[in-house]
Amino acid sequence: MVKRYAVILAAGQGTRMKSKQYKVLHPVCGKPMVQHVVDQVLQLGIEKLITVVGFGAEQVKAQLGDQSEYAFQQEQLGTAHAVMQAAPYLQEKDGVTLVVCGDTPLITAETMQALLDHHLATNAKATILTAVADNPAGYGRIVRDAHGNVEKIVEHKDASEQERAIKEINTGTYCFDNKSLFEALTHVSNNNAQGEYYLTDVIEILKSNGSIISAYKAPSFEETIGVNDRVALAEAEKIMRERICRKHMMNGVTIIDPAHTYISAEVRIGRDTVIYPGTVIEGKTVIGEDCTIGPNSEIKDCWIGNGTTIRHSVAHDSEIGNDVTIGPFAHIRPSSKIDDEVRIGNFVEVKKSTFGKGSKASHLSYIGDAEVGVNVNLGCGSITVNYDGKNKHITKIEDGAFIGCNANLIAPVTVGKGAYVAAGSTITDDVPENALSIARARQVNKENYVDRLSIKKNS
């Protein structure tokens, strides 16, 4: 098998993005653009991957880690100059090299594999990934000879009227015979208006040497889109989102309105789960089977079991079990663990807390830094008072306890197994097992008191 290498061009500053963030690190469906490219390239059996970095190099390295080796482009002097930075790693090697831009997040492993196969089948020294564009203005045109081989690439500004009518364009992705690539790079000149070294000149050099230059058409233009500004970023996000939703639907997930459902690239969802509109599912969230999510819910980096319902709610960085009901308008904050058959109702906030199986907080409660046992009932308005102005403290509510409405549990405190806390109580001391704790003033009724007031209501 021919050895395969890849060079990803990720050194451009991306000034048109008008952003402090390095261009290729802008996310598309929750994943940086360059990570999308790397994930696809690594599916091709690549022996060595070189990412060319420049501005923002350390951020790119932090993102990709040991998935790639790195070449540094001190000055951005053109695409050929960028590829040349990979010479110390690759120039003496036999095989083929893919050159891919780090700002093309929609390119797929399938298309790059087809490009490789076509390159080898045609015995070419260079193969260009092309695409057919409805509006090719601004792109270099692919001019082919009678045999279908590439005769030349003509930039839009230099093209004749006949050449401008060509809709097949250069996408900036290539496959080269590796040694031929690096030999040709030594002959590239910057004798042009921009004073830069262009990778397209390699095509002309190889062609002039009598080498075969081939081209492979991508199945769609959208797959080759380069993201250079926020408009293109939004377009890439839209296309990627459609792909992701389609993949989940083909795997047995019902998405009521894909156009208004936002699922990140690394999310996993089980079959027969239903996703309603306005739902955002991000990070590395895993959702089981037979769940109902949404409408208008936000879930990030959660693990969710089977048969769970989350409506009009937010959940982050938490574990939620089977047959749980959350919402509407609940907030599950990070580091919470909700066991099976728990009910977290409307306007309940849970933060860094555990709920045992079958427990309920049905409405209007704050449960923070708490350990809630099995089959606990937290009445309306229950509050774990966890903060003393300096430190957070833990509340423990053991199995089978019953917390009445509008009860304040002042942490650190423990409510024992089967204990009851009367409605309206403020609990500052531990409650023993099976005890009833009442911590409120006794009701006093003053007969005819209103008649003795100096100021009476007007009738």
Swiss-Prot record:
Biological pathway: Nucleotide-sugar biosynthesis; UDP-N-acetyl-alpha-D-glucosamine biosynthesis; N-acetyl-alpha-D-glucosamine 1-phosphate from alpha-D-glucosamine 6-phosphate (route II): step 2/2; Nucleotide-sugar biosynthesis; UDP-N-acetyl-alpha-D-glucosamine biosynthesis; UDP-N-acetyl-alpha-D-glucosamine from N-acetyl-alpha-D-glucosamine 1-phosphate: step 1/1; Bacterial outer membrane biogenesis; LPS lipid A biosynthesis
Region of interest called Linker, as start-end residue ranges on this chain: 231-251
Keywords: Acyltransferase, Cell shape, Cell wall biogenesis/degradation, Cytoplasm, Magnesium, Metal-binding, Multifunctional enzyme, Nucleotidyltransferase, Peptidoglycan synthesis, Repeat, Transferase
Needed co-factor(s): Mg(2+)
UniProt-annotated binding residues for acetyl-CoA: 386-387, 423, 440
GO molecular function: glucosamine-1-phosphate N-acetyltransferase activity; magnesium ion binding; UDP-N-acetylglucosamine diphosphorylase activity
Keyword Metal-binding: yes
CDD domains associated with the record: GT2_GlmU_N_bac, LbH_GlmU_C
Chain sites annotated for binding UDP-N-acetyl-alpha-D-glucosamine: 9-12, 23, 73, 78-79, 140, 155, 170, 228, 333, 351, 366, 377
EC number: 2.7.7.23, 2.3.1.157
Record-linked InterPro entries: Bifunctional_GlmU, GlmU-like, GlmU_C_LbH, Hexapep, Hexapep_transf_CS, NTP_transferase_dom, Nucleotide-diphossugar_trans, Trimer_LpxA-like_sf
Residues at the catalytic site: 363 (proton acceptor)
Cofactor note: Binds 1 Mg(2+) ion per subunit.
Keyword Nucleotidyltransferase applies: yes
Record: residues binding Mg(2+): 103, 228
GO cellular component terms listed in the entry, alphabetical order: cytoplasm; membrane
Location of region: N-acetyltransferase: 252-459
EC top class, as a word: transferase
GO biological process: cell morphogenesis; cell wall organization; lipid A biosynthetic process; peptidoglycan biosynthetic process; regulation of cell shape; UDP-N-acetylglucosamine biosynthetic process
Assigned protein family: In the N-terminal section; belongs to the N-acetylglucosamine-1-phosphate uridyltransferase family. In the C-terminal section; belongs to the transferase hexapeptide repeat family.
Protein task: Catalyzes the last two sequential reactions in the de novo biosynthetic pathway for UDP-N-acetylglucosamine (UDP-GlcNAc). The C-terminal domain catalyzes the transfer of acetyl group from acetyl coenzyme A to glucosamine-1-phosphate (GlcN-1-P) to produce N-acetylglucosamine-1-phosphate (GlcNAc-1-P), which is converted into UDP-GlcNAc by the transfer of uridine 5-monophosphate (from uridine 5-triphosphate), a reaction catalyzed by the N-terminal domain.
Quaternary structure note: Homotrimer.
This protein's name: Bifunctional protein GlmU
Native organism: Geobacillus sp. (strain WCH70)
Taxonomy of the source species: Bacteria, Bacillati, Bacillota, Bacilli, Bacillales
